From Swiss-Prot:
This is R-spondin-2. Residues 144-204 form the TSP type-1 domain. Keywords: Developmental protein, Disulfide bond, Glycoprotein, Heparin-binding, Secreted, Sensory transduction, Signal, Wnt signaling pathway. Residues 202-243 are annotated as: Disordered.
Length: 243
């Protein structure tokens, strides 16, 4: 009887050891399969169908999407279009939501814009904002040439005169308040003119009226001289015929 009981205990112990060994063997084979699967590189836990579920410390969890399928990866750094967010449980890659941004530093700060766009204060622009100038070699916006407000329109004049003509030009100006960051950056125009109608077309006792009168007097004198010459010619012809 004692012998039978002893044999039964040995059988149970062998079964327990065998089950434990089998479990350990299964865990080792599972870890080995994780290690050989490239999807599971750097994972703390991994699924054959979904890839990494948890990452090792200092790595970032990135959810890759290919068509209808998605699976997790553990990366040293996030891919373009994503930025790393460190958390107490696991570091993750979050998608950059800034328009026309290729690489983000944070949710609202872009460090590299897509081709053809200028970077300015963490945002991407097709054209630099007002007051800033583009640098095409680095595709960034820098301080441009800052100018002050326009002055009032000046007096309407022509040939430095404010009368004597129907139309003239009036001009306004503005000053450069801050020079640009680089000498190659042009400043906007600081003076502009436009056509205007003069307040006084005729100058009071002006030269323009006097010139017109002088021309008329010259014409009258010329006509009188021509008439006198004609009359003198007629008189001479009459005297000759009478002789």
């Amino acid at each position: 009887m004692q012998f039978q009981l002893f044999s039964f205990v040995l059988i149970i112990l062998n079964c327990v050891d065998y089950s434990h060994c089998q479990a350990n063997r299964w865990r080792r084979s599972k870890r080995a399969s994780y290690g050989t699967n490239p999807i599971c590189k750097g994972c703390l836990s991994c699924s054959k169908d979904n890839g990494c579920l948890r990452c090792q410390p200092k790595l970032f969890f990135y959810l890759r999407r290919e068509g209808m399928r998605q699976y997790g990866e553990c990366l040293q750094s996030c891919p373009p279009g994503y930025y790393g967010v460190r958390g107490p449980d696991m570091n993750r890659c979050s998608r950059c939501r800034i328009e026309n941004c290729d690489s983000c530093f944070s949710r609202d700060f872009c460090i590299k814009c897509k081709s053809g766009f200028y970077s300015h204060k963490g945002q991407c622009f097709e054209e630099c904002p007002e007051g800033f100038a583009p640098l095409d070699d680095t595709m960034v916006c820098v301080d441009g040439c800052e100018v002050g407000p326009w002055s009032e329109w000046g007096t309407c004049s022509r040939n430095n005169r404010t009368c004597g003509f129907k139309w003239g030009l009036e001009t306004r100006t503005r000053q450069i308040v801050k020079k640009p960051a680089k000498d190659t950056i042009p400043c906007p125009t600081i003076a502009e003119s436009r056509r205007c109608k003069m307040a006084m077309r005729h100058c009071p006792g002006g030269t323009r009226t006097t010139k017109k009168k002088d021309k008329k007097n010259k014409k009258k004198k010329k006509k009188l001289l021509e008439r006198a010459q004609e009359q003198h010619s007629v008189v001479l012809a009459t005297d000759r015929s009478s002789q």
